[in-house]
């Protein structure tokens, strides 16, 4: 609730110290915390002097593997988070959002304090949240890396119908090129359509203020047993390294359908 409230108060970059700043943490606490904390806007492990070690490897092989999977999910989602950071800086919208943002008229969502939204399109359900109030509509289960649906710690992810989420690859630090390749996760709504955007710039400095950025808009539309995904708009002077090339994954109840190509020309995915 603290991070959700901070977001609503105009402070989008927030997140509790993973493992807890004070007092000792055990393996079970840390496993649950890092699996959830990987989705905080501001995600870091931190501890006070005099407490036990709280590095991911300090709790044994199981928690080290839990931590690896959680952080790989985070790295894959960096293009989405970066886009949300741009939105927060220009509109004030929080990155981590209460569930009721998905449907403000549904009063049953107002009391939900465990599950939360990242942006409009990604729903995060912590492993310890046994009963959650979920928004109506299409929300498909989402797997990002091998093993992220196994065990008792990893948070469950759902992608909203009607959305396109930009993702990257597993990297070791944020200075590496996350967009080689760019992967778009597509989940169609009841009308067989979806849309999304991606913001990217140099990652440091102030050149974006002079137009050194790229803000791209994507659409997807189903026609029969095929889905066409296109780049439909772009602002900014920055040319991305992927040159319009991308992988598209259409998320359905029956599984993932995949294709690759150039977004400027359109990428067709068979269902």
What is each stretch, according to the model?
Residues 1-154, 158:
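Catalytic-domain carbohydrate-binding cleft regions of carbohydrate-active enzymes
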Residues 129-131, 154, 224-228, 266-268:
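A generic structural signal for beta-strand entry/edge sites
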Residues 132-144, 245-264:
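Solvent-exposed beta-hairpin/edge-strand motifs
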Residues 150-154, 260-271:
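Solvent-exposed, conformationally flexible loop/turn segments
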Residues 159-260, 270-271:
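Accessory, solvent-exposed terminal regions and/or long lumenal/extracellular loops of proteins
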């Amino acid at each position: 609730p603290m991070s959700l409230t901070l977001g609503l108060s105009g402070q989008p970059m927030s997140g509790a110290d993973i493992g807890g700043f004070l007092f000792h943490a055990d393996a079970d606490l840390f496993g649950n915390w890092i699996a959830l904390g990987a989705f905080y806007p501001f995600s870091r492990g931190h501890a006070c002097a005099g407490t036990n070690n709280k590095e991911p490897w300090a709790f044994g092989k199981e928690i080290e593997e839990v931590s690896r999977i959680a952080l790989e999910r985070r790295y894959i989602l960096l293009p989405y988070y970066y886009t949300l950071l741009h939105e927060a800086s220009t509109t004030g919208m929080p990155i981590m959002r209460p569930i009721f943002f998905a449907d403000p008229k549904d009063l049953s969502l107002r009391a939900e304090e465990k599950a939360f939204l990242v942006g409009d399109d990604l729903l995060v359900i912590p492993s310890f949240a046994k009963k959650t109030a979920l928004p109506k509509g299409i929300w498909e289960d989402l797997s990002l890396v091998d093993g992220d649906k196994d065990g008792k710690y990893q948070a469950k992810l759902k992608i909203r119908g009607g959305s396109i989420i930009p993702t990257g690859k597993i990297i070791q630090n944020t200075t590496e090129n996350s967009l080689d390749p760019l992967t778009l996760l597509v989940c169609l709504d009841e009308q067989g359509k979806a849309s999304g955007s991606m913001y990217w710039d140099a990652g440091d400095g102030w050149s974006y203020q002079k137009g050194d950025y790229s803000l791209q808009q994507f659409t997807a539309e189903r026609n029969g047993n095929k889905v066409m995904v296109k780049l439909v708009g772009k602002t900014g002077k920055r040319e991305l390294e992927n040159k319009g090339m991308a992988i598209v994954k259409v998320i359905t109840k029956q599984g993932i359908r995949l294709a690759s190509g150039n977004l400027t020309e359109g990428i067709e995915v068979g269902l």
